[in-house]
Amino acid sequence: MSAMGAGPDHLFNLRNNFYLGAYQTAINNSEIANLSPENAVERDCLVFRSYIALGSYQLVISEIDESAATPLQAVKLLAMYLSTPQNKESTISSLKEWLADSTIGNNDTLRLIAGIIFMHEEDYNETLKHTHAGGTMDLYALNVQIFIKMHRAEYAEKQLRVMQQIDEDHTLTQLASAWLNLAVGGSKIQEAYLIFEDFSEKYPMTCLILNGKAVCCMQMGNFDEAETLLLEALNKDAKDPETLANLVVCSLHVGKSSSRHLSQLKLSHPEHILVKRVSSAEDNFERAVQLVA
């Protein structure tokens, strides 16, 4: 997890690439000399999480063996959870066993992965049980996301303030600030847009940055500009779930068909929340039709 101590941060660029969604760049530039054993484990975690973000679950599962350090075992568990949704109960059961083990249960990476998995499950109370104590920038940032999903902006703001006290310029602090500004809305949307604009000027453009700018544009009613940004993101990754989901919404607002983007999202990410909501709406419609028939 992100170090908060003094001294040179050998993983700064790798971490930054991961946070901003430049996953292949993170993987390609992960050979870093003279890392401490602890930093080497963190490096490997970031590389394997980048592979997970790219959908290469089986590579992660096969590469991390039983003798690997706890943080890597936790990352492997995330890959198993995402790769086989039908077996997620056994994965969650293993996760809970590890969290209950006093020798490893407080490991920062294990707590982070637990938070990510339980957030996927939309079990926010269980998520916070493991993440609320914070301790790393990654955990504080995850807490901001969780509280936003719970519509508790005031708690998200408290977590953000902790991050700002630690490092106001940290990429995760800036991202968390943008997420919160988007959630609050109103005049804060422009502030969020400026954060993503700043990222786009400092770093190579990624789907994450483009989607951030596009969501800001949509919230400000600039759907044509949002569509341009999202199509640029689609050119970078035709299967990126957030790009496809945002294109579905944007297409509806600009009067274009969203069926192709929705079909692609259903095929490549059947567990995505938008797919589930559309399927639920379709089921309700079918039931209503049957009642009328």
Swiss-Prot record:
Coiled coil: none annotated. The keyword Repeat does not apply. Keywords: Cytoplasm, Cytoplasmic vesicle, ER-Golgi transport, Golgi apparatus, Membrane, Protein transport, Transport. It is found in: Cytoplasm; Golgi apparatus membrane; Cytoplasmic vesicle, COPI-coated vesicle membrane. This is Coatomer subunit epsilon-2. GO terms for cellular component: COPI-coated vesicle membrane; Golgi membrane. GO terms for molecular function: structural molecule activity. It is a peripheral membrane protein. Oligomeric complex that consists of at least the alpha, beta, beta', gamma, delta, epsilon and zeta subunits. It comes from Arabidopsis thaliana. The coatomer is a cytosolic protein complex that binds to dilysine motifs and reversibly associates with Golgi non-clathrin-coated vesicles, which further mediate biosynthetic protein transport from the ER, via the Golgi up to the trans Golgi network. The coatomer complex is required for budding from Golgi membranes, and is essential for the retrograde Golgi-to-ER transport of dilysine-tagged proteins.
